[in-house]
Amino acid sequence: MQNLQEKKIAIVCDWIKDWGGAEIVLEQMLEIFPNADIFTSIFFGGKKDIFKNRVIKTSFIQNIPVLNKSHKLALFFRPLAFESFDLSSYDIVISSTSAESKGVITKPETLQICYCHTPTRYFWSHYHEYINMMEFGFLNPIGKWLMPKIVHNLRIWDFVASKRPDYFIANSENTAKRIKKYYNRESEVIYPCLDIENIPFSNEKEDYYFYNGRCIPYKKFDLIVDAFNENGKKIKIATNTDNKLYRELKEKSNSNIEWILTNDLDLINKLHSKAKAFLFPPEEDFGLVPIAAMASGTPVIAYGRGGALETVVSGITGVFFEEQNEISLNKTIDYFEKMNFDSEKIRNHAMSFDKKMFRKNLIEFINKKLEN
């Protein structure tokens, strides 16, 4: 570890704006490498302690109004932004990415590692979904007309950029398969982790279900609302995203659905710990939120695809629903309510995703590559 701390390290990420799973991974990397500098297209990370006294270098996009507020609009400029960064003085460059930041250019002697949350979704696996759910407002028609005409060249750039890292780390087996499919690169899996020991645990559950996350289309808040409008059961939904979708779904919700607009992590953890079950309807590349729920002793009802298959153990820490619709979800909720779960076993399973494991595995990986 002493060797590593003597190296000059840069951590590159796509953008720092909202706080989600990728940002939690970034935070843990910064704890592991307290002297690392940050490179990112835009930074609106607020006053979090982890960024205090830290060198943070942003791209030209930071100074362009409108673009600096919309990472979707800025996607056309990010390849240039990341290729413009001067990383020539760094010994190790680590990109934590689901988009373009893997495309930074380094010197031949620099060890460049990509921690990949997913190959760029809007170029590859979820291209058609993104086309159909653009959030450009009045510019949506232009985006839908333009994107099909330029996506081929963007895919070529993304594929070329995927050859720049010396090594890939995948955040899940699910992501590793995508990295192989779209980039033809091998990767080693190191799971993202949470500070499990500091997540409150409770054996006592109350009569409500719970879901939280950013209120954006692929997180499937609409599925939750449709299912619970139908079944009439109590659910609390927490989000930090006050947008058009949030307001539309809140208006559509029946009285059994309680919306909570909050950034308060302590409140979120408390809601996790008291819920009878946490719902997880999206197909995620990995998904840290179900781990937070399980750490609190709460079982998970998850869509049976993607990263949830690597974290939730059916019948022990939760159950899966087979189709991404309200009929399948409600059928599984009815099945879940006839089951019994051991909160202690659920918590113990979550401990395998504690941040100490992430730290150990990442340091071992980098040291091994330095020896090569």
Model segments located where?
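Short hydrophobic beta-strand element within catalytic cores of glycosyltransferases
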Residues: P299-Y303, V312
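Acidic donor-binding loop of glycosyltransferase active sites
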Residues: S273-D285, T298
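Conserved donor-binding/catalytic core segment of Leloir-type glycosyltransferases
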Residues: P200-K219, V225-A238
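A charged, aromatic-enriched C-terminal amphipathic alpha-helix characteristic of glycosyltransferases
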Residues: L80, Q324-I327, E337-K369
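Active-site donor-binding segments of glycosyltransferases and PAPS-dependent sulfotransferases
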Residues: N35-K102
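Membrane-proximal helix-turn-helix segments that form the acceptor-binding/catalytic region
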Residues: E135-F168, A176
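Nucleotide-activated donor-binding/catalytic signature segment of Leloir-type glycosyltransferases, i.e.
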Residues: Y246-D266
